[in-house]
Amino acid sequence: MRRLASLAVALPLLAVVASPALAQDMSPRQSAEAFGVPAVSSSWVNQDGSTMTLVFGAGNSVSGFYVNNAPGFGCQGTPYPLVGLTWGNFIGFTVAWDNATANCNSVTSWTGFAEAAGSDVTIVTDWNLAYQGSSSGEIQQGSDTFTLVNKAMKETPKM
């Protein structure tokens, strides 16, 4: 598997991964701590300048907003709802590209893991974008690395 060796990260992350039963029953605070962030909103940016706000919720749930700024893609510059799940330092989240501003008739899902290196925390992901092609549904694939920008936002973006 890609980057399997990188799973050996900070001790708090290893403790959660080593015990799936613990990860399954984690509180929002414990889930957030596995990602190296407090149990409030956190802001992330990827290599293309897209941003997301993650809010760790009940159980293993995560929600928030995603703002696409990737060159060559539509639905840019406005927040779209994000929903997902965490398992220890692993994460999966999805954005349906439809809000009051624009509907791109597509859905993107990311899966990945958080890792810490010194004071930096990143989420390394692969994504699948499902959209309507010229004659049928198509899937485009890629990868993103998100870097933690700030550990505690006082408010989330307005929809």
Swiss-Prot record:
InterPro entries: Avidin-like_sf, Avidin/str
Keyword terms of this UniProt record: Biotin, Disulfide bond, Secreted, Signal
GO cellular component: extracellular region
Temperature dependence: Is highly thermostable. Displays a Tm value of 62 degrees Celsius (apo form) and 74 degrees Celsius when complexed with biotin.
Pfam families, A to Z: Avidin (PF01382)
Disulfide bridge partners, by residue number: 75-104
Lineage top rank: taxon: Bacteria
Signal peptide segment: 1-23
Main location: secreted
SUPFAM superfamilies: Avidin/streptavidin
Keyword ATP-binding listed: no
Binding sites annotated in the UniProt record for biotin: 46, 50, 66, 68, 74, 106, 108, 144
Domain Avidin-like per the UniProt entry, residue ranges: 36-151
GO molecular function: biotin binding
Subcellular location: Secreted
Metal-binding in keyword set: no
Transmembrane segments: none
Chain's role: The exact role played by afifavidin is still obscure. Forms a strong non-covalent complex with biotin and 2-iminobiotin.
Domain-related comment: The C-terminal segment plays a key role in the formation and stabilization of the octameric configuration, since the short afifavidin (lacking the last 5 amino acids) is only dimeric. The X-ray structure of intact afifavidin shows that the C-terminal segments stretch into the biotin-binding sites of adjacent non-canonical monomers.
Assigned protein family: Belongs to the avidin/streptavidin family.
Oligomeric form and interacting partners: Exhibits a dynamic oligomeric assembly: the apo form self-assembles mostly into toroid-shaped homooctamers, with a small fraction of homodimers, yet upon biotin binding the intact afifavidin consists solely of the dimer.
Protein name: Afifavidin
Organism the protein comes from: Afifella pfennigii (Rhodobium pfennigii)
Organismal lineage: Bacteria, Pseudomonadati, Pseudomonadota, Alphaproteobacteria, Hyphomicrobiales
